[in-house]
Curated annotation (Swiss-Prot):
Family: Belongs to the thiolase-like superfamily. Thiolase family.
Organism: Shigella dysenteriae serotype 1 (strain Sd197)
Catalytic activity field: an acyl-CoA + acetyl-CoA = a 3-oxoacyl-CoA + CoA
Protein name: 3-ketoacyl-CoA thiolase
PROSITE patterns reported for this sequence: THIOLASE_1, THIOLASE_2, THIOLASE_3
Organism phylogeny: Bacteria, Pseudomonadati, Pseudomonadota, Gammaproteobacteria, Enterobacterales
Amino acid sequence: MGQVLPLVTRQGDRIAIVSGLRTPFARQATAFHGIPAVDLGKMVVGELLARSEIPAEVIEQLVFGQVVQMPEAPNIAREIVLGTGMNVHTDAYSVSRACATSFQAVANVAESLMAGTIRAGIAGGADSSSVLPIGVSKKLARVLVDVNKARTMSQRLKLFSRLRLRDLMPVPPAVAEYSTGLRMGDTAEQMAKTYGITREQQDALAHRSHQRAAQSWSEGKLKEEVMTAFIPPYKQLLAEDNNICGNSSLADYAKLRPAFDRKHGTVTAANSTPLTDGAAAVILMTESRTKELGLVPLGYLRSYAFTAIDVWQDMLLGPAWSTPLALERAGLTMADLTLIDMHEAFAAQTLANIQLLGSERFACNVLGRAHATGEVDDSKFNVLGGSIAYGHPFAATGARIITQTLHELRRRGGGFGLVTACAAGGLGAAMVLEAE
């Protein structure tokens, strides 16, 4: 085993995760239609502080993320500070690591805690797939800039005359990778074919995710970590995630047509995570600061790792790459884990990563390691369901998974939990959590 990297301050304090909260997650263009990510972020951070009863001035830093950027609020973190009654002097900045954004936010706050520059901070993320930055064509954008600099009406009219009707059409946000032009679903199809993952296996995982998420809600396991969202103009509320299909059957999944490779594909809307709106956040402190304030943490951040691979083929293998590093830095093995929670971007991606974590060939030939990371025990894996069921507001998913895993670890009497995700650009993230 490689070098263990303890996540402690210079005084030996562990990094405590005090509490976490999220909004319910809503499918695109449903309950949160028209509510921008910055407002979802304010909603969850305001409620998190109110529930924790921690004075706002205790929080010295807020690191927040947003993947679908809105030009009018480029620093979502600072807008949340200013919009929630937090101390105006609270440091705040924004991060983006695609689907691992709130993992990055947590890591950044943890690094500030270890450096000794703060003793308490908030990390999280929010995204809206319903409020999108609809742009204009490159030609229209260029003409508008030139028109702004034109001095006479004739110059302006001449510039506008260059435009055609197609140049006036709105341009939605890109759904493909900038570098390759591939959509995430195209990559999921690649992975299904590369690793021999069948449609039946994908549908079974998706069905499992929905069944377990529905059961988690019915048993009341998520009530403490999901707020009730009152939706402007405050005539409606949302108390639970609205994507979960607890009454579906495997036969229902089989009816859907492939969404990306129409002829030969196996990836469908049902075995993929949907576009979703929502926000999530966690409070982190040094262990000594929690004792000063009389707080009992949910748990502790034991280690983390971020990785990057090539984007042209099977790029959603982040968990298979980042997990062995995070375990190594924590001084643990897969056998030591009580729970494993992997972001389910697609069932195909999830199953491919599970396969490679247990592969000796992948470990030796690709990672340069002597042994496989370890088989994933189904009884420990995504026990409360995953992103296919809950939904995936890109920047919020990491904070959801962290909070959910720590609560479940505490229900089980403590232990270690692995949380991990793939992300666009061939990125990967993994963290090891500890609860007592």
